[in-house]
């Protein structure tokens, strides 16, 4: 049998010297240039002599081919470094030789060496048609040698078996388990000094985590460590201290040290694998599109190296098990690694890092390079506790963002399926304009296969609502430069714009303020405002001192998302949206003076003030929407009581009006009672909410019929009596026509202008039928639950053990409990009870808990809010109805005229802003196209030589257009600079 310490492969040979402990003294890393004949991911080999065939029993030793080959000089390093790459070295351990060799053979098989001898098949596995090397070394007449082996000596002499030289001590540590552990995941927790002189308590398993063998077998690339190893880090600090404590990501260390241009955040709670894969596969398709832009300065074939995807799960006990299975299938996650405590410190998050080359689509089928999938750098952060979405964003921005310093950050929710070019269009908005701090994509409702989801009126109404918002509201706000909300489901931010000033005040500090609000210090106004914390972030960006950031709507970047399809889920979602939007709008209006301290131009400030006026009017209409709904119904249906226009005759219209009026009032009162006392998720209350919705359907449908009858009758009466003057705005027919045309008509017009009119034919009827429910049910429920500032994902799951426990014994039919067994114990307890009754000992009252104080405070404020809301709407409704009683001529009703014409004016204002958005985009596209064509004609195109001739360097955008920023987000040349350059060139 060949002595073990002389075993080498037929691929390489390396000589090392050792210290007394048997550990490697050589710290120098030798890197040979790759040879054409080497396999993917292997170091080049020294040529072997063909006259020395390999023995079938043991591997041969390489022969010297040329005489000019010299032995590498002995290293001069006396001792090993204390750590490698920020991770501490292990102390020398001793292991059973059989375990070591079996682990070595497994690793040799994993990297294509077949486990014994040379195997030309790079995907070969151990034990397939050949005798395993570890058995060849151990078997000697049926006997196995006993004894121990120093790890360092063995590995650096024999690690070539899997085709790559190990130049790091961490590789040595990763070949076998640590003492006392039989798995391949082990790595002890150590403390190492960081750059600040403190200590870093980390459990790093970077070198330990091989990817599964099956996954490794079909990977197209196995030439880098990031493709063959998964890195795990147990984080024991707060996300704000991630960088300070010395934690690093793969993009900060070693050969994977790279700059990050695009950082994508995917937040999830308990979504299943279908929702996760539809989002993740959409991201992978977007990354493939980035890599397909070969003419880009920023992107190209290796563009994936500038993109990092971070998936953050909110709570280890909350994440869906099948979602973890999907991540494991991609190689990003491995079970059995994570620990709760490291160095007596509680772990706050488990961070897994891997560069995956496969993707799972919605049908859970693998997609790889054959389908255009490119590598994707992934970070999976599994939070130990459920601390809500805001905390997940703090991990993203303050922990991983500070480590990577990206240019653009994109936020996605699990369940959102981005279009294949959506992320590129979002990034492009920042590349073309250095003043853009945030961008919003278009959110579309998932209509299901074959649009069958529209058969549900709730889904159809939300589809219409989303479409109108993306056609009228978002373009209008984008023209002014301030979008009230960038949806967390699909939005992007410039990382530099989010940073706080030296004093610590800025967008991110205000954004994360809502996470630290506790107890009575968290007033109801602030707590509800931070239910829509993304609105606060938008405002802080636009109003940032001494800056001129703007927000932009990118209609070409769209993604589909699931919408609630049940009434309880829909009501709960809108409760959070409505309360957050209302209080955030109040916050922005109260602090509008911050705009004066910005560096915006005078024109921009004027536009922003116009938008504030528009938002103030919209806020008033929202607050008094309940009274306006009742008054509109009161006057339109009350016109039936006028005998001169009663379409039914015999005072039937009056009786119908009285019945409908009482039903409407009773339903509104019932809505307040239900909102104050019940949850939508309650089984008994669901039917009541459905009944409420259907009652409103009937009322609204009848109102529409009444309107049609009255409009027709009024028009006929005007035709029969031409002697009466027909003044615009002086009759109900004109008011109703103008109001209807300004809403429904403009909806149709703008939808056709944006070439997206299908929702008007498939979803408009459902929306208008559900409109009373939007006003009454949703708005009332939101104001009646201002005390509820949760996201509905947090509960008390802690089990108290102060009463002890009962343990089952035997077959499980009997339990064992601790009971007072001595008679003395029983008598003393009885004596204490009698003495307390006789002396009337005062029982101390337990102090009120902080949670109870907070709940009482929130509910008391809720009472004031609901009372104010009810009183204000009731006063308005009663005052106007008394001023214009039933039977009075409806044409002289000035309040109804004001309401209807205000609706028309607001709709027209939205249409003008939306049209301006379209015109600006068209003009910008034409201007950019002409400048690009002139640039290519003068300077020879957008290639590197043409840019050098122009002297523009990196001032142009990635496609050669007049981008204002470079790929790294630094400010470049303005349009005037480009124009002057062209003029100088022409003049020369």
From Swiss-Prot:
<feature type="compositionally biased region" description="Low complexity">
    <location>
        <begin position="44"/>
        <end position="66"/>
    </location>
</feature>
<dbReference type="GO" id="GO:0071555">
    <property type="term" value="P:cell wall organization"/>
</dbReference>
<keyword id="KW-1133">Transmembrane helix</keyword>
<dbReference type="GO" id="GO:0004100">
    <property type="term" value="F:chitin synthase activity"/>
</dbReference>
<feature type="region of interest" description="Disordered">
    <location>
        <begin position="29"/>
        <end position="75"/>
    </location>
</feature>
<dbReference type="Pfam" id="PF13632">
    <property type="entry name" value="Glyco_trans_2_3"/>
</dbReference>
<keyword id="KW-1003">Cell membrane</keyword>
<dbReference type="Pfam" id="PF08407">
    <property type="entry name" value="Chitin_synth_1N"/>
</dbReference>
<keyword id="KW-0961">Cell wall biogenesis/degradation</keyword>
<feature type="transmembrane region" description="Helical">
    <location>
        <begin position="864"/>
        <end position="884"/>
    </location>
</feature>
<dbReference type="InterPro" id="IPR004835">
    <property type="entry name" value="Chitin_synth"/>
</dbReference>
<dbReference type="GO" id="GO:0005886">
    <property type="term" value="C:plasma membrane"/>
</dbReference>
<keyword id="KW-0472">Membrane</keyword>
<feature type="transmembrane region" description="Helical">
    <location>
        <begin position="732"/>
        <end position="752"/>
    </location>
</feature>
<feature type="transmembrane region" description="Helical">
    <location>
        <begin position="656"/>
        <end position="676"/>
    </location>
</feature>
<keyword id="KW-0812">Transmembrane</keyword>
<feature type="transmembrane region" description="Helical">
    <location>
        <begin position="764"/>
        <end position="784"/>
    </location>
</feature>
<keyword id="KW-0328">Glycosyltransferase</keyword>
<feature type="transmembrane region" description="Helical">
    <location>
        <begin position="577"/>
        <end position="596"/>
    </location>
</feature>
<keyword id="KW-0808">Transferase</keyword>
<feature type="region of interest" description="Disordered">
    <location>
        <begin position="950"/>
        <end position="988"/>
    </location>
</feature>
<protein>
    <recommendedName>
        <fullName>Chitin synthase 1</fullName>
        <ecNumber>2.4.1.16</ecNumber>
    </recommendedName>
</protein>
<dbReference type="GO" id="GO:0030428">
    <property type="term" value="C:cell septum"/>
</dbReference>
<feature type="transmembrane region" description="Helical">
    <location>
        <begin position="911"/>
        <end position="931"/>
    </location>
</feature>
<dbReference type="InterPro" id="IPR004834">
    <property type="entry name" value="Chitin_synth_fun"/>
</dbReference>
<feature type="transmembrane region" description="Helical">
    <location>
        <begin position="616"/>
        <end position="636"/>
    </location>
</feature>
<dbReference type="InterPro" id="IPR029044">
    <property type="entry name" value="Nucleotide-diphossugar_trans"/>
</dbReference>
<feature type="compositionally biased region" description="Low complexity">
    <location>
        <begin position="957"/>
        <end position="976"/>
    </location>
</feature>
<dbReference type="InterPro" id="IPR001173">
    <property type="entry name" value="Glyco_trans_2-like"/>
</dbReference>
<dbReference type="Pfam" id="PF01644">
    <property type="entry name" value="Chitin_synth_1"/>
</dbReference>
<comment type="function">
    <text>Polymerizes chitin, a structural polymer of the cell wall and septum, by transferring the sugar moiety of UDP-GlcNAc to the non-reducing end of the growing chitin polymer. CHS1 mainly responsible for normal yeast cell reproductive growth.</text>
</comment>
<comment type="similarity">
    <text>Belongs to the chitin synthase family. Class II subfamily.</text>
</comment>
<dbReference type="InterPro" id="IPR013616">
    <property type="entry name" value="Chitin_synth_N"/>
</dbReference>
<dbReference type="GO" id="GO:0006031">
    <property type="term" value="P:chitin biosynthetic process"/>
</dbReference>
């Amino acid at each position: 049998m060949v002595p073990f310490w002389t075993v080498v492969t037929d691929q390489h040979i390396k000589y090392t010297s050792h210290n007394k402990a048997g550990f490697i003294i050589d710290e120098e890393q030798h890197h040979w240039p790759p040879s054409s004949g080497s396999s993917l991911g292997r170091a080049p080999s020294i040529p072997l002599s063909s006259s020395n065939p390999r023995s079938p029993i043991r591997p041969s030793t390489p022969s010297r081919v040329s005489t000019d080959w010299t032995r590498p000089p002995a290293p001069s390093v006396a001792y090993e470094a204390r750590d490698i790459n920020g991770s501490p070295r292990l102390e020398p351990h001793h292991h059973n030789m059989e375990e070591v060799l079996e682990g070595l053979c497994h690793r040799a098989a994993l990297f294509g060496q077949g486990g014994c001898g040379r195997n030309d098949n790079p995907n070969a596995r151990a034990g397939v048609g050949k005798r395993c090397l570890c058995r060849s070394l151990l078997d000697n007449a049926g006997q196995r040698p006993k004894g121990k082996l120093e790890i360092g000596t063995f590995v650096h002499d024999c690690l070539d078996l899997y085709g790559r030289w190990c130049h790091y001590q961490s590789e040595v540590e990763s070949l076998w388990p640590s003492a006392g552990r039989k798995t391949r995941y082990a790595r002890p927790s150590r403390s190492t000094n960081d750059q600040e002189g403190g200590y870093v308590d980390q459990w790093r398993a970077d070198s330990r985590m091989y990817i599964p063998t099956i996954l490794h077998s079909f990977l197209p690339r196995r030439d880098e460590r990031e493709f063959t190893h998964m890195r795990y880090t147990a984080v024991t600090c707060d996300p704000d201290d991630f960088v300070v404590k010395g934690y690093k990501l793969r993009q900060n260390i070693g050969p994977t040290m790279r700059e990050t241009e695009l950082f994508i955040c995917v937040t999830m709670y308990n979504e299943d694998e279908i929702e996760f894969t539809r989002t993740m596969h959409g991201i992978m398709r977007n990354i493939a599109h980035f890599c397909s832009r070969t003419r880009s300065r920023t992107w190209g074939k290796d563009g994936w190296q500038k993109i990092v995807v971070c998936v953050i799960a909110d709570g280890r006990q909350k994440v869906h098990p099948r979602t973890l299975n999907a991540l494991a299938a991609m190689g990003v996650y491995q079970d059995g690694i994570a620990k709760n405590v490291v160095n007596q410190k509680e772990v706050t998050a488990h961070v897994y890092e891997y560069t995956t080359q496969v993707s799972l689509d919605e049908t859970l089928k693998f997609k790889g390079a054959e389908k255009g999938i490119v590598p994707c750098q992934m970070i999976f952060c599994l939070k130990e506790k459920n601390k809500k979405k805001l905390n997940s964003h703090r991990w993203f921005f303050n922990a991983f963002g500070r480590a990577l310093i990206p240019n653009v950050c994109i936020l996605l929710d699990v369940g959102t399926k981005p279009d294949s070019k959506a992320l590129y269009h979002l990034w492009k908005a920042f590349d073309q304009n250095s003043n853009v701090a945030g961008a919003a994509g278009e959110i579309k409702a998932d209509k299901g296969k074959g649009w069958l989801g529209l058969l549900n009126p709730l889904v159809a109404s939300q589809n219409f609502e989303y479409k109108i918002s993306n056609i009228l509201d978002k373009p209008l706000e984008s023209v002014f430069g301030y979008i009230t909300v960038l949806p967390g489901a699909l939005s992007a931010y410039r990382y530099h714009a989010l940073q706080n000033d030296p004093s610590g005040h800025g967008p991110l500090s205000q954004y994360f303020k809502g996470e630290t609000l506790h107890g009575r210090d968290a007033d109801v106004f602030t707590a509800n405002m931070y239910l829509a914390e993304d609105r606060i972030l938008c405002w802080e960006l636009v109003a940032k001192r001494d800056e001129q950031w703007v927000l932009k709507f990118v209609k070409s970047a769209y993604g589909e998302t699931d919408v609630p399809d049940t009434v309880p889920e829909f009501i709960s979602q809108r409760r959070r949206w409505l309360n957050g939007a209302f209080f955030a709008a109040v916050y922005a209006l109260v602090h509008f003076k911050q705009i004066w301290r910005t560096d915006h131009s005078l024109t921009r400030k004027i536009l922003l003030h116009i938008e504030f006026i528009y938002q103030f009017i919209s806020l008033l209409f929202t607050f008094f929407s309940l009274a306006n709904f009742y008054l509109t119904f009161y006057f339109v249906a009350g016109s039936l009581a006028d005998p001169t226009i009663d379409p039914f005759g015999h005072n039937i219209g009056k009786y119908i009006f009285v019945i409908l009026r009482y039903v409407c009032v009773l339903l509104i009162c019932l809505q307040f009672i239900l909102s104050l006392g019940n949850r939508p998720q309650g089984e008994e209350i669901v039917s009541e909410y459905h009944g409420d919705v259907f009652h409103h359907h009937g009322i609204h449908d009848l109102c529409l019929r009444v309107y049609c009858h009255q409009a027709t009758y009024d028009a006929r009466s005007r035709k029969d009596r031409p002697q009466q003057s027909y003044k615009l705005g002086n009759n109900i027919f004109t008011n109703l026509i103008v109001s209807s045309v300004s809403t429904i008509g403009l909806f149709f017009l703008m939808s056709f202008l944006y070439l997206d009119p299908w929702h008007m034919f498939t979803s408009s009827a459902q929306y208008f039928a559900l409109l009373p429910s939007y006003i009454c049910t949703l708005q009332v429920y939101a104001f009646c639950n201002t005390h509820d500032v949760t996201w509905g994902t947090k509960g008390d799951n802690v089990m108290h053990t102060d009463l002890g426990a009962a343990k089952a014994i035997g077959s499980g039919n009997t339990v064992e409990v601790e009971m007072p067994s001595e008679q003395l114990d029983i008598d003393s307890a009885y004596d204490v009870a009698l003495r307390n009754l006789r002396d009337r000992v005062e029982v101390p009252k337990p102090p009120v808990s902080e949670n109870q104080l907070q709940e009482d405070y929130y509910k008391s404020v809720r009472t004031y809010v609901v009372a104010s809301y009810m009183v204000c709407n009731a006063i308005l409704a009663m005052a106007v109805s008394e001023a214009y009683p039933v039977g009075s001529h409806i044409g002289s009703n000035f309040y109804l005229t004001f309401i209807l014409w205000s609706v028309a004016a607001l709709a027209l204002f939205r249409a003008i802003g939306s049209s301006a958005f379209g015109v600006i985009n068209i003009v910008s596209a034409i201007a950019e196209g002409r400048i690009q064509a002139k640039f290519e004609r003068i300077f020879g195109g957008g290639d590197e030589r043409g840019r050098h001739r122009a002297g523009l360097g990196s001032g142009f955008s990635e496609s050669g257009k007049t981008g204002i920023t470079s790929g790294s987000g630094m400010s470049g040349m303005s349009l005037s600079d480009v124009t002057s350059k062209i003029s100088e060139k022409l003049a020369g």
